[in-house]
From Swiss-Prot:
Subcellular compartments: Mitochondrion
Biased composition (Gly residues): 39-48, 80-91
PANTHER family: RIBOSOMAL PROTEIN S9 (PTHR21569), SMALL RIBOSOMAL SUBUNIT PROTEIN US9M (PTHR21569:SF1)
Name this protein carries in UniProt: Small ribosomal subunit protein uS9m
Amino acid sequence: MLSRLFLRHSNLRFVTLVSSKSNSQIFSSFIRPLSTNSSGGGGNGDGNGRNRNDVPWSFTGVNDDKSGPFSSDDSFGSSGVAGSGLPGGEGKWPEEPKRWNIKEEEEKVVFDTGGEVGQGIETSRERRGNEWEETKRWDMKEGEEKVVFGGGGDEVDGFGIRGEVKSNEWDVSKPWNLKEEEEGVVFDTGGEVPFSFENSLEMAEEERVKKELIEKEEKELLEVIKGPDRAFGDLIAKSGITDEMLDSLIALKDFQGVEGLPPLTEIENLRREKSSKKSSRAEIELQMQEDIAKARVRQVDETGRAYGTGRRKCSIARVWIQPGEGKFQVNEKEFDVYFPMLDHRAALLRPLAETKTLGRWDIKCTVKGGGTTGQVGAIQLGISRALQNWEPDMRTSLRAAGFLTRDSRVVERKKPGKAKARKSFQWVKR
């Protein structure tokens, strides 16, 4: 369809119709019943026995012999081309034209200027005489090497190949190089000194330094003119007196003339005495520490034995220790006989192992009440306290190990309505 928009030479108008393939007769016979002729195919005297209205698609610009791009007065059109529809032809109307295809249009001449092939643009086909020959398609690389604008010569309007101008004899321009550009003058101003970026940075730095010096001098002058905020301000700051303290003194000075208030000197003296005087609680604590220090001396009876009492649950133990060969008796029995379990015997000897005096003491104790576990705990606490009374320096190690702490855990009492202290009876719903 686009081919109708371009102008063609008169001698090439019917070439397209001749070279195009003829449509099949099946299509034309299929369209024939659509004719509006009521004569049923009768002749009209043009020699082919067919009416003009039998043409299924009768376009004014294509089939009309008086107007359109195919109407012409030259000898070629009147010579009688088959299918032209003119009186000088064979009397047959042109068959249905083939649909437009972009691939076929690209193979044809896009711009037809009077029958000559456009210069500078290669087409897929070129007419030479009466034969059609295949030509090479246009290549971008080869097109760059050829003349872009021009007919058949090497020069067109003074421009040569590769953009050189030969009429004015200009030299081919060299590609831009950064190294050569840095060595030369970037902006040639007729002998003037070129503008340097480094010089501008140095000037900006100098201006900044000058500005800082001016601001510093102004600040020093303002400090000298205004002076400190308060008289002897530096001395007050160094002495540690804060603004809150000064405000409190000023407030007390304001109440100096009020009746019923003591003078300011008496108030200051009372405050000074209260701060320097020791409190009664501190005195009590100091007295207790002195008493404890006096009590940390060896405490032995008339026989030279240290005594200690221990309690655990319901058991009460009384322990006497003295330097000896390592004998250990519980209720007039050897402790390994009284406590057959190895864990109980090891628990009794732990205070001695902690003080590193195992085997250096003769221990005699009596215990009553409670069970085996309670009696073991009571004897252990009694031994620890007896060691402390014999040698007060052992208190630190025994205290750190926890042997001087009384275990206050006892059996919890039974509650009413329960089987034991916390155990409940079996609950029955009904």
